[in-house]
UniProtKB/Swiss-Prot annotation:
F-type ATPases have 2 components, F(1) - the catalytic core - and F(0) - the membrane proton channel. F(1) has five subunits: alpha(3), beta(3), gamma(1), delta(1), epsilon(1). F(0) has three main subunits: a(1), b(2) and c(10-14). The alpha and beta chains form an alternating ring which encloses part of the gamma chain. F(1) is attached to F(0) by a central stalk formed by the gamma and epsilon chains, while a peripheral stalk is formed by the delta and b chains. This is ATP synthase subunit delta. Its main location: membrane. InterPro entries: ATP_synth_OSCP/delta_N_sf, ATPase_OSCP/dsu. GO terms for cellular component: plasma membrane; proton-transporting ATP synthase complex. Belongs to the ATPase delta chain family. Keywords: ATP synthesis, Cell inner membrane, Cell membrane, CF(1), Hydrogen ion transport, Ion transport, Membrane, Transport. The keyword Transcription does not apply. It is a peripheral membrane protein. Coiled coil: none annotated. F(1)F(0) ATP synthase produces ATP from ADP in the presence of a proton or sodium gradient. F-type ATPases consist of two structural domains, F(1) containing the extramembraneous catalytic core and F(0) containing the membrane proton channel, linked together by a central stalk and a peripheral stalk. During catalysis, ATP synthesis in the catalytic domain of F(1) is coupled via a rotary mechanism of the central stalk subunits to proton translocation. This protein is part of the stalk that links CF(0) to CF(1). It either transmits conformational changes from CF(0) to CF(1) or is implicated in proton conduction.
Amino acid sequence: MAELATIARPYAEALFRVAEGGDIAAWSTLVQELAQVARLPEVLSVASSPKVTRTQVAELLLAAAKSPLAAGAEAKNFVQMLVDNHRIALLPEIAEQFEALKNEREGAADAEIVSAFPLNGADLDSLVSGLERKFKRKLKPTVEVDSSLIGGVRVTVGDEVLDTSVRARLASMQAALTA
């Protein structure tokens, strides 16, 4: 995984520099669409087929993207470069790193919130507001429900984890009692 990140980083950074000259959000959408297409086993199979030219593979990827940027020369050059260098499989990692660069530029971060129970809109807004004060940045939350937490929430922002779940407290108590 670290190898993929290392290989994908220069591509993501180069694409981000291109995106800074235009609409970063639109470029983010395009790279996410391309990553979804590149995850399909059929696309990877076609891309590795000797019967299909590299130009055809690039055209296939761009045709599958709905973003209007896909028709632009910069997008075509980017995809053609990935195809020529046999880097299509890196698109999901490139998209992830592009999103991280975008978040960094916006002073934002993705927050994965796992709750023991479904959160209604007001509870989620209150939680996100408190978390934004704690982490000192704008958060983009994704919420999951995991009843095995018993109660509370576990929040992951980047490499930081805030676990206030009952399960974590019980595990901490168990460790203290058995030590």
